[in-house]
């Protein structure tokens, strides 16, 4: 007689993909709206993007219960900051806060993989990419989530500066115009949904520039 062993994990991976691209005066952040577990789609209309400040937006994939808890912590700490300083956090400051928050939980981490994007104090686009325990870097572009292994090689091919080095450093911003960056992001997701079953349904795109924040959407594969 075989003995069955109970197996329970505090984590799940709800899939999904996030992409961010920074330009000279803009930032584009995009994510699909599919949330799934295993081979089951839980919902086709779940936004992975949240506005943290007037010039700062975060997109997250991974375990969405942990993501929601992380979002609440960041929102409450940003509210305290506003009461103490009478102003909103800058995007680089929010980037440091997110790193500290993730690192604080490193022994039982938030199972979330985040990209933070927005405009810095000079009006330049900025993108910060993270691992699950708070290690982060400012880059010109990044992707997180189940489709990132498909999208990052494509972004490297299109955007990484030519260099004789094997792994050249990224520039802090990309040379693309805002319209070119949006088209590139749409192409990335259209390709990724062909190969990644955890990415699909609908693409949500958030564009930040000096005029403010606007949103665009695009339909993706639903199978």
Curated annotation (Swiss-Prot):
Q: Where in the cell is it found?
A: Cytoplasm; Nucleus
Coding gene?
Answer: PBF1
* GO biological process assignments: proteolysis involved in protein catabolic process
Which Gene3D superfamilies does the entry link to? Glutamine Phosphoribosylpyrophosphate, subunit 1, domain 1 (3.60.20.10)
Alphabetically ordered keywords of this record: Cytoplasm, Nucleus, Proteasome
UniProt protein name? Proteasome subunit beta type-1
Its main localization is cytoplasm
Function of the molecule: Non-catalytic component of the proteasome, a multicatalytic proteinase complex which is characterized by its ability to cleave peptides with Arg, Phe, Tyr, Leu, and Glu adjacent to the leaving group at neutral or slightly basic pH. The proteasome has an ATP-dependent proteolytic activity.
> Origin, by domain of life?
Eukaryota
GO cellular component terms listed in the entry, alphabetical order: cytoplasm; nucleus; proteasome core complex, beta-subunit complex
Q: Lineage, please? A: Eukaryota, Viridiplantae, Streptophyta, Embryophyta, Tracheophyta
Write out the similarity annotation.
Answer: Belongs to the peptidase T1B family.
Which CDD domains does the annotation name? proteasome_beta_type_1
On subunit structure and binding partners, the annotation says: The 26S proteasome consists of a 20S proteasome core and two 19S regulatory subunits. The 20S proteasome core is composed of 28 subunits that are arranged in four stacked rings, resulting in a barrel-shaped structure. The two end rings are each formed by seven alpha subunits, and the two central rings are each formed by seven beta subunits. The catalytic chamber with the active sites is on the inside of the barrel.
């Amino acid at each position: 007689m075989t003995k069955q062993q109970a197996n329970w994990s505090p984590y799940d991976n709800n899939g999904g993909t996030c992409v961010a691209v920074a330009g000279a005066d803009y930032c584009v952040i995009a994510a699909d709206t599919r949330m799934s577990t295993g081979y089951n789609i839980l919902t086709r209309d779940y936004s992975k993007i949240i506005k943290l400040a007037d010039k700062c937006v975060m997109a997250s994939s991974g375990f969405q219960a942990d993501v929601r808890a992380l979002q609440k912590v960041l929102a409450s700490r940003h509210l305290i900051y506003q009461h103490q300083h009478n102003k909103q956090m800058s995007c680089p400051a929010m980037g440091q806060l997110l790193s500290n928050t993730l690192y604080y939980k490193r022994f039982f981490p938030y199972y979330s993989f985040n990209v933070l994007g927005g405009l810095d104090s000079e009006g330049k686009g900025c993108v910060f990419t993270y691992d699950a325990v708070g290690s982060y870097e400012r880059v010109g572009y990044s992707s997180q989530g189940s489709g990132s292994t498909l999208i990052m090689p494509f972004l490297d091919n299109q955007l990484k500066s030519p260099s004789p080095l094997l792994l050249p450093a990224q520039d802090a911003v990309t040379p693309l115009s805002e319209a070119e960056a949006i088209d590139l992001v749409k192409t990335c997701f259209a390709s990724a949904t062909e190969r990644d079953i955890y990415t699909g349904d609908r693409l949500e795109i958030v564009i930040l520039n000096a005029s403010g924040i606007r949103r665009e959407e695009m339909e993706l594969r639903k199978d």
